[in-house]
UniProtKB/Swiss-Prot annotation:
It comes from Rotavirus A (strain RVA/Human/United States/D/1974/G1P1A[8]) (RV-A). GO terms for molecular function: nucleotide binding; RNA binding; RNA-directed RNA polymerase activity. Its EC number is 2.7.7.48. One of its GO terms (biological process) is viral genome replication. Interacts with VP3 (Potential). Interacts with VP2; this interaction activates VP1. Interacts with NSP5; this interaction is probably necessary for the formation of functional virus factories. Interacts with NSP2; this interaction is weak. Its cofactor is Mg(2+). It comes from the Viruses. RNA-directed RNA polymerase that is involved in both transcription and genome replication. Together with VP3 capping enzyme, forms an enzyme complex positioned near the channels situated at each of the five-fold vertices of the core. Following infection, the outermost layer of the virus is lost, leaving a double-layered particle (DLP) made up of the core and VP6 shell. VP1 then catalyzes the transcription of fully conservative plus-strand genomic RNAs that are extruded through the DLP's channels into the cytoplasm where they function as mRNAs for translation of viral proteins. Keywords: Magnesium, Nucleotide-binding, Nucleotidyltransferase, RNA-binding, RNA-directed RNA polymerase, Transferase, Viral RNA replication, Virion. Its main location: virion. It catalyses: RNA(n) + a ribonucleoside 5'-triphosphate = RNA(n+1) + diphosphate. It holds the Pfam family RdRP_4. This is RNA-directed RNA polymerase. Residues 501-687 form the RdRp catalytic domain.
Length: 1088
């Protein structure tokens, strides 16, 4: 019985502890004799419980089932309704309830007042500022904590200390909640006015954050940090996270580098034993002291003290505590403001006439030139993507909101929807579709707004622009991004790199004669001063490009793009404020355009270049690197003398002065040893990531179900754990138990077992062992996987009805006709499937599929259907391979130094033995020749799944496929007849398998799979010339060895003698692997 199942049965007896409660375990087996006993056992249990008899004698009688079969689920039956939480909570509510300081925040509603003081009536009330937006309730969270506390009340020694720390913190939470009563949620897990009116408005979200924090306490330091954040975040709902995390931008500049990793010419990390001294002018210490004083003013005591104590010797060993504080600060929850404040925040900036026009001019010209450089080649060559930009835009049209709800008719069905894709279909059907006209967003048609909430920052607004903007920008932006892909300055987009590569880039040029300048430009991006020069630079670039081509289609594409920029220079937004919708002229850049990321990166690059060109007037230096990454930019400058305190101070002040000449509200810092940007920070020559993902509060409500959210919760827990913030695993498992249970009736619930939730089926939620993805190969595992596959795809009546309507069919046909030179069923079907999949984001379709899936699941969890599926999964392949491997003990010494101090020990150990990788493994098939050939002639982008299907077809069919996509018949013929085609077969299979094995997710993305140290543990005699088989055997061996090392901290070596006769069988099987989509895989993808 795994740990999960043990916790499950204990949890059930904890929650349903009355006389009437019954828990019936349900078992299954792939062995038909044992399966009969399982069914018998279940029937007798149900019968006994109906008659109120004890189940104990049955457990004795059916010992064979309990010992040899696999637990499928537990059926729980209880009359008791939930007032159990309140009853149990009283026992912990022994402390003094917190009192909110009602003057802690500048904006009135951010103070934690009693709800009825903020909202006089139910009509006025909104939960949007405190909605935890997660499909689990405060009462469940309280239950999970009390379950953990009860389970550990008898712990001894060090574990008892953890128990006491958490108990003490929970007493604060329990006492405060108990004073007002536990807020009851409705069926959508929202908290209504009636429930909240006599309680503090932020009680729920505060309690969720506090529970998340207290369940992450292990050491005494954790306890002090958590206590302070829990108590202060009850009152300070606005600036706490920002105050606590501000010092980090300076702390990274204080630690000497003594040995670090740098990126070498081969783009690998290599150790360098260089020593770089941290040179810190007094001014910087004064700024830091001011930050610490601000923390104290806000009532913080222990956290500023810890920072102050660390400052005495600034050691790298003790820096982990600083990085811990930095991560913890985000767990106070999201800062959710009213839209009106979020919007006005950007409009409050004072305009001054006193700006350096020359610098603005240079900035605009740099943007212009960069745009030209990015698009010059595709424009001069009349690139087909720019010619067919409209089609490309339609093919990748998202199903996000189009800003207004419309009544749409699909066949006989009339629906209301805001989705872009549906609006496009409807407009085409009614002749309203005019992609050549970009609708204005002026005072007559103001832009509706979305929001982005993030801990420690103000709420930001997002434009929800009409779909015409997307179509106009899509193709051009794709070309900009493909340029950025091979330009190192764009750290975020640079080809398959990951953050480790960017880390090595910075450390590479740090030395006694260089300094690094790093700037956070998030304020600048959304400031009013940016908008005119920014849009004008883009417009000027587009004008220059228009003169480089004679193709009217390319000119049209560029003109439409230009029109979007012109329209957005005169933009108005609509903001709901109470019952009125205000129209406000909005003169700043906001996210929501397709170009947001690319254009911001271009602008930030232009900005830092402008600044550096001014600095160069005064100092003589060489710019070693310039990088932009999202809202941040940084540059390493190399001087011809050693850097002194005075130099650092002068450069720092000059840079700030230059920014102020542009009236840019940015935070610019200069250091000799480290940087801090939003995504990562480098200190003491090591790389750190902020572990700030909230677990029990979400930013917004999407259409994911409880199962999906349980998988996301687990995935967030894993990411935090890799980054150095660990939450108690038992608590996470308890949350998964709660969130994956399925109600049958009011008093009857079904709880799936570990096997159901960890087997890679369409229902997978978590891994039984953190960081290790297992692919079950035992009979019972394969049996249950097959059973689940039989019910994986669910029909939706609404979706079918929409898809069979003329409107939908015409749209798909329009796309196919525009795309294809000749009919091709694979592509047409692909388009129809993609378009139909987009309907999933329309709630009724989603709910319908979900209901069908839940009812199928309910049937399955009570008795699995034996099902002979002809589908082959990756498990089948691994199952065929496994028997031919022989394991023996091995030894790998630790040979690499640590560069990511926050990693858990077992993961750190593996990296220190086999090394890390600085690249993403290509798992999309885009590196294959066939993919390149298609993109040369067509705007269609086949998925890895489609390529995998196509490449295994007969040669003639591949040729037809290519020709139908516009590849000239002669090229298609050459391709199929060449050796490239057989290499492609291998490449695509490789990508597909990597994709299935999630090799770029979790902690696998950190390991060097091509490490020679790893290779030498594997011995596979070379038998035939089937590279695909050799590949899968090696990959399986590597995963086995790495998983063993993570789990046991020791190494094994594998020998495989794979019979030649089996190879060809395996090879054939490998062309029929089915991909499984599960909440687990979507959660991984969601992390991206």
């Amino acid at each position: 019985m795994g740990k999960y199942n043990l916790i499950l049965s204990e949890y059930l007896s904890f929650v349903y502890n009355s006389q009437s409660a019954v828990q019936i375990p349900i078992y299954y087996s792939s062995n038909s004799e044992l399966e009969k006993r399982c069914i018998e056992f279940h029937a007798k249990c149900v019968d006994s419980s109906k008659r109120g008899l004890s189940l104990k004698p049955l457990f004795e009688e059916y010992k064979d089932v309990i010992d040899n079969a696999t637990l499928l689920s537990i059926l729980s039956y209880s009359y008791d309704k939930y007032n159990a939480v309140e009853r149990k909570l009283v026992n912990y509510a022994k402390g003094k309830p917190l009192e909110a300081d009602l003057t802690a925040n500048e904006i009135d509603y951010e103070n934690n007042k009693i709800t009825s003081e903020l909202f006089q009536s139910a009509e006025e009330y909104t939960d949007s500022l405190m909605d935890p937006a997660i499909l689990t309730s405060l009462s469940s969270n309280l239950n999970a904590v009390m379950f953990w506390l009860e389970r550990h009340s008898n712990d001894v020694a060090d574990t008892n200390k953890i128990y006491k720390r958490r108990l003490d913190l929970f007493t604060i939470v329990a006492s405060t909640i108990n004073k007002y009563g536990v807020p009851r949620h409705n069926e959508k897990y929202r908290y209504e006015y009636e429930v909240m009116k006599d309680k503090p408005y932020y009680l729920v979200t505060w309690a969720n954050s506090s529970i998340e924090m207290l369940m992450s306490v292990f050491s005494h330091e954790d306890y002090l940090i958590a206590k302070e954040l829990i108590i202060l975040s009850y009152s300070n709902r606005s600036t706490l996270a920002k105050l606590v995390s501000s010092p980090m931008s300076i702390l990274v500049a204080l630690i000497d580098i003594n040995g670090t990793f740098i990126t070498n010419e081969e783009l690998e990390l290599e150790f360098s034993d260089k020593y770089v001294k941290a040179i810190v002018p007094d001014q910087i210490f004064d700024e830091l002291q001011e930050m610490i004083d601000n923390m104290r003013k806000a009532g913080l005591v222990d956290i500023p003290r810890m920072i102050q104590e660390w400052l005495v010797d600034c050691s790298l060993e003790k820096f982990t505590l600083m990085s811990k504080i930095y991560s913890w600060s985000f767990h106070v929850g999201f800062r959710k403001q009213k839209m009106i404040d979020a919007a006005l925040d950007q409009l409050k900036t004072e305009y001054t006439e006193d700006v350096d026009g020359e610098m603005y001019n240079e900035y605009t010209m740099l943007i212009r030139d960069e745009i030209v450089k990015m698009l010059e080649v595709p424009v001069k060559h009349d690139d087909h993507l720019l010619r067919d930009s409209e089609l490309a835009g339609l093919l990748s049209m998202s199903s996000a909101s189009n800003g207004e709800s419309r009544q749409l008719k699909f066949g006989r069905k009339t629906i209301f929807s805001t989705k872009k894709n549906m609006h496009v279909m409807d407009d085409i059907a009614h002749g309203r579709y005019t992609p050549g006209v970009i609708p204005p967003v002026n005072v007559d048609r103001p832009i509706p707004l979305g929001r982005r909430d993030v801990p420690g920052r103000r709420t930001r607004i997002i434009f929800i622009l009409p779909y015409e903007y997307f179509i106009a920008q899509h193709a051009v932006v794709e070309k900009m991004l493909s340029y950025a892909k091979h330009t190192r300055e764009y750290a975020e987009f640079y080809s398959q790199s990951n953050q480790l590569l960017s880390y090595g880039d910075v450390t590479r040029f740090l030395s006694s004669n260089s300094m690094v300048l790093y700037t956070d430009v998030s304020q600048w991006d959304s400031s009013q001063h940016n908008t005119q020069p920014f849009r004008k630079g883009i417009i000027m670039g587009l004008d220059m490009l228009s003169n480089m081509t004679n193709d009217p289609k390319v000119v049209q594409t560029l003109n439409l793009y230009k029109q979007t920029q012109i329209n957005l220079m005169d933009s108005y937004v609509q903001i709901p404020d109470g019952n009125v919708i205000k129209k406000i002229q909005y003169g700043a850049v906001a996210s929501g355009e397709k170009q947001t990321k690319a254009a911001n990166s271009i602008a930030n690059l232009a900005l830092i270049k402008t600044v550096l060109s001014r600095i160069a007037n005064k100092y003589s230096f060489i710019t070693k690197i310039i990088r932009v990454d999202g809202d941040d930019n940084y540059a390493v400058l190399q001087f011809n003398t050693d850097v002194t305190k005075q130099m650092v101070q002068d450069v720092s002040n000059d840079v700030r002065y230059i920014y102020s000449r542009m009236n840019a509200k940015v935070k610019a810092l200069v250091s000799t040893v480290g940087i801090e940007i939003a995504k990562r920070y480098i200190a003491g020559g090591k790389i750190f990531f902020r572990a700030g993902i909230n677990l029990l509060n979400n930013e917004k409500r999407g259409q994911s179900t409880q199962w999906d959210q349980a998988a996301i919760l687990y995935s967030n827990y894993i990411v935090n754990k890799l980054r150095g913030f660990e939450t108690d695993r038992e608590f996470i498992l308890t949350k998964i138990i709660q969130m994956t249970s399925v109600a049958i009736t009011g008093s009857l619930r079904l709880f799936p077992s570990e096997r159901v939730l960890t087997t890679n089926s369409t229902f997978k939620v978590f891994d039984s062992e953190d960081f290790i993805i297992e692919y079950g190969t035992t009979n019972d595992e394969v049996y249950i996987q097959r059973a689940f596959m039989s019910l994986s795809s669910q029909k939706s009546g609404i979706a079918d009805e929409i898809a069979s309507s003329q409107t939908f069919k015409n749209y798909v046909n329009k796309l196919s006709d525009q795309l294809l030179i000749s009919k091709n069923v694979i592509v047409s079907k692909g388009i129809a499937v993609t378009e139909k999949a987009k309907l999933n984001s329309y709630a009724p379709v989603y709910l319908e599929k979900r209901r069908a899936q839940i009812s199928a699941l309910l049937t399955m969890l009570q008795k699995p259907v034996s099902f002979k599926s002809n589908k082959i999964t990756i498990n089948d392949i691994l199952r065929d391979i496994k028997p031919f491997f022989v394991t023996s003990e091995a030894n790998l010494p630790i040979q690499y130094r640590k560069f990511m101090p926050t990693l858990p020990n077992n993961v750190q150990y593996v990296i220190q033995c086999i090394g890390s990788r600085t690249y993403q493994i290509e798992d999309s098939g885009s590196k294959s020749s066939i993919s390149k050939l298609i993109s040369k002639y067509s705007v269609y982008k086949p998925s890895i799944e489609e390529l995998y299907k196509v490449i295994s077809l007969r040669e003639q069919e591949i040729q037809l496929y290519l020709v139908s996509l516009g590849v000239p018949p002669v090229d298609a013929g050459t391709y199929v007849g060449s050796r490239i085609y057989s290499q492609d077969k291998y490449k695509i299979l490789e990508s597909y398998v990597y994709n299935l094995l999630s090799i770029n997710y979790g902690c696998y993305q950190l390991f060097d799979f091509n490490s020679p140290d790893l290779e030498k543990l594997i011995r596979i005699p070379f038998k035939g010339k089937i590279p695909a088989v050799t590949f899968i055997l090696h990959l399986y061996a590597k995963l086995e060895i790495i998983n063993y090392a993570i789990k046991n901290g020791a190494w094994i070596s594998l020998f495989c003698n794979y019979p030649k006769s089996e190879m060809i069988k395996l090879w054939k099987k490998m062309w029929n692997i089915t991909a499984l989509r599960s909440p687990y895989t979507s959660a991984n993808f969601f992390q991206d």
